[in-house]
A protein has these predicted regions:
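Acidic, polar-rich low-complexity tracts and alpha-helical solenoid repeat scaffolds
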Residues: 1-164
Length: 164
């Protein structure tokens, strides 16, 4: 499909660029088949992190696949929260393919899995940014009272506890 799209006479320049990136990422994926990944979390971070191209869908979907496998093995604690955070960031970037607000649920689950940790704080900040952006417009940011209250509650739950 990716190859056919790039070769289609009807394909726009953007579609042809996407095809090139997808084909490169698919080749990388094929080359990695059968190789043992020493640290799946780091591999997911590599695939989903850093500055990704505009057409990083293949890499992001690979990362989410790894993360879902990790979450099936261990769905509690800081590692699970970290996996949920990375998945949230990946789904945030994948939003344009129709997964709209799925990333928000990952951020919320991350906060629930490991409250009062640095990972939960990162998840809260990403969730807060998403909510703020969602209620932004040309006249400014207009967060409903219920959303502000929810954000305050989540912030309290997410922020690492300060040691006396």
């Amino acid at each position: 499909l990716a190859q056919a799209m790039g070769k289609s006479s009807d394909a726009t320049l953007s579609m042809k660029e996407a095809s090139k990136v997808w084909m490169k990422d698919i080749r990388e994926w094929q080359d990695a088949r059968g190789k043992t990944v020493v640290d799946p979390m780091k591999e997911a971070e590599r695939l989903a992190g850093g500055r990704l191209s505009e057409h990083a869908e293949v890499r992001l979907l690979r990362a989410t696949s790894i993360l879902h496998e990790l979450l099936q093995k261990s769905s509690e604690g800081e590692d699970a929260a970290r996996a949920l955070y990375i998945a949230g960031r990946a789904y945030d970037q994948l939003g344009e393919i129709g997964l709209w607000n799925l990333h928000e649920f990952y951020y919320l689950a991350c906060i629930d899995k490991a409250p009062h940790t640095a990972t939960a704080e990162k998840c809260y900040r990403s969730y807060d940014e998403t909510m703020t952006l969602g209620y932004s417009g040309s006249s400014g940011v207009h967060l409903p009272k219920s959303v502000k209250e929810d954000l305050a509650r989540l912030k309290e739950k997410a922020m690492p506890t300060k040691k006396p």
